[in-house]
Amino acid sequence: MGAGERAAGGGGAQDPGAGCGSRALSALCLLLSVGSAAACLLLGAQAAALHGRVAALEQERELLRHAGPSGALAAWAETHLERLLREKLDGVAKLRTVREAPSECICPPGPPGRRGKPGRRGDPGPPGQSGRDGYPGPLGLDGKPGLPGPKGEKGTPGDFGPRGAQGQDGVAGPPGPPGPPGARGPPGDTGKDGPRGAQGPAGPRGEPGQDGEMGPKGPPGPKGEPGIPGKKGDDGMANQPGLPGPPGPKGEPGDVGPRGENGVDGIPGLKGEPGHPGVDGATGPRGAPGLKGEQGDTVVIDYDGRILDALKGPPGPQGAPGPPGIPGAKGELGLPGAPGIDGEKGPKGPKGDPGEPGPAGPKGETGEMGLSGLPGADGPKGEKGESASDHLQESLAQIIVEPGPPGPPGPPGPMGLQGIQGPKGLDGAKGEKGTSGERGPHGLPGPVGPPGLIGLPGTKGEKGRPGEPGLDGFPGPRGEKGDRSERGEKGERGVPGRKGVKGQKGEPGPPGLDQPCPVGPDGLPVPGCWHK
């Protein structure tokens, strides 16, 4: 076998695969060609149909254009009328003249059917003929007033009239408002003393005063009853000597002694009765009349009912403190004041009066020698003795050597100095409560103190009330009558007023005419026609 034959055998083995691929490709191309041809035919048919419809529409439009509007309207109306007539005939009840039934039916005729529904409303009919003219109506109402005319020209001024008679004085005008405050006038004369003021309230309780000086010794008291002998007290400590005793009776004038010390001031005497009031002084001379004030304004201002406040001027500056006044007269006895606050505890008072003698106790044992008793009462005046030094020595010798019987208790001496507190004694029986003493007289008024320092400026006071209206001033002189003024221009026409209230209904008019009256050129009946 040669090489050519092998090549031919190899080519025959590969042909079946290549043939299948070419056949599939050819079939696909054929399907696409058939689809495209069908689509072209479908589009051509649709385009032909659309073209025919457009041609028909154009032809119909041309026919309508050539037929004109009246023919088209008549054709449209004819079709609608036929349709409406057909609907109307269908709604009308149909009467059967001959019974439409087969010959073999022997049934009686049935009842007539019910009435049908009303048909549609028909088209409006043609307008009727115009009637004859009516009778003329009654007279109309008055027309509205016309617009105001233009302003007239200015008239010529009239002649001056005769001079009028002198008029009477007019009524005095109302009081004018208060004028400005005038200058401060000279100080007036001293006025009369005013009436005595009412009793003032009781003043506050004064502070306790300083201890006064020792007063003079009082008169000797009555002889006291002998007291109960007390227990022996402890020996006291040496203290300052006591105050001198009361002076004895006046003796014979002795030799001129040295000058004594100044005496103690006495207790102030009682307040004297108030004096009679003095006689009123004579009235001073009348001052010169002031200058005539200016004419006040006649405008009345109410000031909200506070005229007194309106007349008051603004408060002036604070004045300097005045000189101290004269001490006033003593007032009447005031009412007893309220009980004051309890004061501080005072110093220990003097020893009280001796109590009543108790029952006699058993005789005690002889005690030791007691203290020397108080000096006895003054004896009768003796004769003029010898010199004071010798008499004093003999008196002392008698007292020491020959002790006499104890004399009656003398008057209580002045309070001694504060001694050392002794042991606490036994409480005595409680005495009865004494009656309250009478109220002492009021002391004399003290001297007037020096004027105090100027106080701080006070706060601004409230607004004063308006003052009362002043008295009517004297009417001024009547002025001369002025010249007659020229006639003023004519005023403009006023604005028309509002529409008035509707009037009552008028009475019925006369009966109308049986036949028409001729009408004049103004549209109204000829005068005299309706009187016939």
Swiss-Prot record:
> Residue ranges of the Collagen-like domain?
108-166, 173-232, 240-298, 313-372, 404-452, 455-514
- Family matches, as InterPro entries: Collagen, Collagen_Structural_Proteins
As for subcellular location, the record says: Cell membrane
Does the record carry Cell membrane as a key word? yes
Question: What's noted about post-translational modification?
Answer: Undergoes proteolytic cleavage by furin protease to yield a 60 kDa soluble form that forms a homotrimer and exhibits a low affinity interaction with heparin.
Q: Which GO terms describe its cellular component?
A: cell surface; collagen trimer; collagen-containing extracellular matrix; extracellular region; extracellular space; plasma membrane
The record lists the membrane-crossing segments as 24-45
Query: Spans of biased composition, class Basic and acidic residues?
Result: 342-354, 380-393, 427-441, 478-495
Q: Which residues lie on this side of the membrane: Cytoplasmic?
A: 1-23
> What UniProt keywords apply to this chain's record, in alphabetical order?
Cell membrane, Collagen, Membrane, Repeat, Signal-anchor, Transmembrane, Transmembrane helix
Q: Give residue ranges on the Extracellular side.
A: 46-532
GO MF annotations in UniProt: heparin binding; identical protein binding
Query: Composition bias, kind Pro residues: at what positions?
Result: 174-184, 314-326, 403-414
Please list the residue ranges that the record marks as compositionally biased, kind Low complexity. Answer: 129-145, 196-207
Is-annotated flag, keyword Transmembrane?
yes
Q: What is this protein called?
A: Collagen alpha-1(XXIII) chain
